[in-house]
Design a protein with these regions (language model features):
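A polyanion-binding, active-site-adjacent surface
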Residues: 2-182, 186-227
């Protein structure tokens, strides 16, 4: 078992946040088949593209135990990753939903998905303290992901969390501003940073984030990794 896998096992046993522990225990009483634990990261450990989300959805990855699995956000994300050649889900399944459960055979190619918070929070809003408790896991994870070239931050919390890591390790975050499609690339940065709206239903069902907009994000990521894109 390598260090990255060991870290994920450690994450699933975490009980640092009493509010979240109690919240998940209450959900588990009602839905006994739900995962209801911290959700580990998912993907290719040699990936060049790191995707950062916010937190598990109550009825998505909190239910299934795998990042972006079992809800509308996952359907939107994995459909786009398939179109980008970054996951193996066959087109004929129709992506309804794209990712059903942790044992459905889905595999990621050259991308790795993590999140700034590992437990489903009430109202999908982790507190600053809860984000801080998870941050050490993110720091360790990035250290172990040796091949990352491009970071795709899904939402402002993911974007700000990555900037916090930069401030600790590289530079001050002066000049960084979250906006969909913003790209930060510099010889002083360890990775190319691409900002995107989160594929939440609040964004996708209102048209704030369209499939075309999301495809453009991963088209850019592919271009920075390979020099070209098939999207």
């Amino acid at each position: 078992m390598n260090k990255l896998t060991q870290l994920q096992n450690q994450i699933t046993r975490c009980k640092k946040c009493p509010r979240l522990v109690n919240y998940l225990e209450e959900i588990k009483k009602k839905y006994r088949t739900y995962w209801c634990k911290p959700v580990p990261s998912f993907g290719d450990q040699n990936a060049e593209i790191l995707i950062i989300g916010l937190a598990p959805g109550r009825f998505g990855s909190n239910r299934t135990g795998r990042m972006f699995t079992g809800d509308a956000s996952g359907e939107f994300l994995y459909k786009t990753l398939f179109e980008a050649g970054l996951c193996n889900k066959p087109a004929e399944v129709g992506f309804k939903p794209a990712s059903v459960h942790a044992g459905d055979g889905l595999k990621l190619k050259n991308c790795y998905i993590t999140a700034m918070a590992r437990c489903a929070p009430p109202q999908n809003k982790p507190t600053p303290k809860e984000l801080e408790n998870c941050f050490s896991y993110f720091v360790e994870e990035v250290k172990l992901l040796k091949n990352v070239k491009v970071v795709v931050a899904l939402g402002k919390i993911a974007f700000d969390g990555y900037l916090k890591w930069l401030c600790n390790d590289v530079l001050q975050k002066k000049g960084f501003k979250f906006s969909h499609g913003a790209i930060y690339k510099s010889k002083d940065l360890p990775h190319i940073l691409i900002a995107s709206y989160h594929p939440s239903r609040q964004n996708t069902q209102t048209g704030r984030l369209t499939p075309k907009m999301f495809r453009q994000i991963f088209k850019k990521a592919l271009q920075y990794c390979y020099g070209t894109s098939n999207m």
